Amino acid sequence: MPTLEWIGKSKVINHHQDVPFRVLERKYSFDENGQHNEDNGSENMIIRGDNLEALKALLPRYEGRVKCIYIDPPYNTGNEGEDLTRHDKWLCMMYPRLKLLQKLLADDGVIFISIDDTGYAKNVLRRERRKLLPPFLQK
């Protein structure tokens, strides 16, 4: 089976397991009347903080239960300037997040990843999971 290799992969391959657990604390809630300092009982959450730590914090409650995930990661198009290692850096950033998302995803769940046309050919991390669907294009 083909594998994707990049500089730094060995350092991040298990990084998602090393991310510390954080407890999600409800500090306020929202409803049609605005913000409240007390919990209104809603299961919806706005999480402020590092997204890697937030994903790890969701695992105890939602592991294997999420039916639909949509992410819109940075496109890695090089608009910030050409860097010969930018693809490696992007993969090192994305891999642990995708591994945690995979743990959250239900067996019959689906993940949508928003990427641009040039990123499509480069986004092969999702291919490590065998349940692939054809790309969904929106113009």
Place the predicted regions along the sequence by residue.
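DnaQ-like (DEDDh/DEDDy) 3′-5′ exonuclease domain used for proofreading
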Residues: 1-70, 75-96
